[in-house]
C-alpha cells in the first residue's frame, strides 16, 4: 500500500522509507548545552547515515508543579534555535502551546509539534495549520489510535496535510503508560497512511502518585525502542542528556548521551531488516 511522504526540506518521512531520527533534549536548559547535545547528535547521525531533526522545547507549559523549570521562553528559545541552525544546518522540531505562538515558531523551525495534552484544541490546530509548516501530532494518552484520524482531518480542513503522527503511549490505570504496537498501523489506516513515529522517551514515563514530577524507566529504553522499530515506522523520537540524573525535565526517561551511537546502531539494523521484507497481506 502506498505510504504518504512528508518532506522536511530534503528529508523524506514515510513509513516505508529509512527511519528519521527526531532527537535532542527535552527542554532548552542553556544555549551551550543545546549546542553540545545537537553537535553530538549530528556527528553520530552523519556517521550512521540517519536523517536527523533536532528536538528541544523552549517552554514546558504543562509541568506538574508550578515550581518546575519550564525553559527560556519564546523569544530566547527562538534565538537559540536560530544559532543551532546556523552552526549545524539541522532541521528543528519544537512544540507550541498557544495559538498566538504558532506563526512565530514556524518562522524559525521546520516542524511544529502539537502536544498530547492539547491535541484536540481546535483553535490551536487551526492556527498551526495556517502556518503551512510540517506538523507533528503527539497522540494523547487518553485517545485511541483510531481517533487520530479526526485530528488529521482538522488539519486538512485548515489547509495543511503535512502531518506526522507520534505515539507516546496510552494510560494504563493511574500513573502508568503502556504502548500498543498494534495501534501504529491503526493510525496509519485512519490517516491515509501518514507517517507514524514513536516517542520512546515519553512512553517510558511513570509517576509517583504523590509526586510533583514524572519518573521514568530509562533502563528499558532499548527494549521498547526495538519493539517499536520492528513494526515498521517512519521515525523514532528520542531525548538524550549527558547527565540524566541532573536534567531539568524528564531525566529518568532520557537516554545517556554517550549511549546514543550504540543505541542507534541497533535501531538502524532493525529498521533496515524490517523494511527489506515484502509487504505481506494476511487479510485474504
From Swiss-Prot:
EC number: 2.5.1.55
InterPro entries: Aldolase_TIM (IPR013785), DAHP1/KDSA (IPR006218), KDO8P_synthase (IPR006269)
Pathway as given in its UniProt record: Carbohydrate biosynthesis; 3-deoxy-D-manno-octulosonate biosynthesis; 3-deoxy-D-manno-octulosonate from D-ribulose 5-phosphate: step 2/3; Bacterial outer membrane biogenesis; lipopolysaccharide biosynthesis
Intracellular or extracellular location(s): Cytoplasm
Gene: kdsA
GO cellular component: cytoplasm
One GO biological process term: keto-3-deoxy-D-manno-octulosonic acid biosynthetic process
A molecular function (GO) term: 3-deoxy-8-phosphooctulonate synthase activity
PANTHER family to which the protein is assigned, alphabetical: PHOSPHO-2-DEHYDRO-3-DEOXYHEPTONATE ALDOLASE
Domain of life: Bacteria
Recorded catalytic activity of this chain's protein: D-arabinose 5-phosphate + phosphoenolpyruvate + H2O = 3-deoxy-alpha-D-manno-2-octulosonate-8-phosphate + phosphate
Protein name (record): 2-dehydro-3-deoxyphosphooctonate aldolase
Pfam families assigned: DAHP_synth_1 (PF00793)
Keyword entries, A-Z: Cytoplasm, Lipopolysaccharide biosynthesis, Transferase
Amino acid at each position: 500500500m502506498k505510504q504518504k511522504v512528508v518532506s522536511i526540506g530534503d528529508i523524506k518521512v514515510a513509513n516505508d522509507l529509512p527511519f528519521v531520527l527526531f532527537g535532542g533534549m527535552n527542554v532548552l536548559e542553556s544555549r551551550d548545552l543545546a549546542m553540545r547535545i545537537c553537535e553530538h547528535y549530528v556527528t553520530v547521525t552523519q556517521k550512521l547515515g540517519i536523517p536527523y531533526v533536532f528536538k528541544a522545547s523552549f517552554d514546558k507549559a504543562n509541568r506538574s508543579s508550578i515550581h518546575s523549570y519550564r525553559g527560556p521562553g519564546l523569544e530566547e528559545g527562538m534565538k537559540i534555535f536560530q544559532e543551532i541552525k546556523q552552526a549545524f544546518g539541522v532541521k528543528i522540531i519544537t512544540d507550541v502551546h498557544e495559538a498566538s505562538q504558532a506563526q512565530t515558531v514556524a518562522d524559525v523551525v521546520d516542524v511544529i509539534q502539537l502536544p498530547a495534552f492539547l491535541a484536540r484544541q481546535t483553535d490551536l490546530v487551526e492556527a498551526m495549520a495556517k502556518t503551512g509548516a510540517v506538523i507533528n501530532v503527539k497522540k494523547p494518552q487518553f485517545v485511541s489510535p483510531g481517533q487520530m484520524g479526526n485530528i488529521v482531518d482538522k488539519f486538512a480542513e485548515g489547509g495543511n496535510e503535512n502531518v506526522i503522527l507520534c505515539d507516546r503511549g496510552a494510560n494504563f490505570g493511574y500513573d502508568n503508560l503502556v504502548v500498543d504496537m498494534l495501534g501504529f498501523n491503526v493510525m496509519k489506516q485512519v490517516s491515509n497512511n501518514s507517517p507514524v513515529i514513536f516517542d520512546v522517551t515519553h512512553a517510558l514515563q511513570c509517576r509517583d502518585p504523590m509526586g510533583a514530577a514524572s519518573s521514568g524507566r530509562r533502563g528499558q529504553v532499548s527494549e521498547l525502542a526495538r519493539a517499536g522499530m520492528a513494526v515498521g515506522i517512519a521515525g523514532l523520537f528520542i531525548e538524550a542528556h549527558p547527565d540524566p540524573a541532573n536534567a531539568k525535565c524528564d531525566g529518568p526517561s532520557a537516554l545517556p548521551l554517550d549511549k546514543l551511537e550504540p543505541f542507534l546502531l541497533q535501531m538502524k539494523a532493525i529498521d533496515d531488516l524490517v523494511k527489506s521484507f515484502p509487504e505481506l497481506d494476511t487479510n485474504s
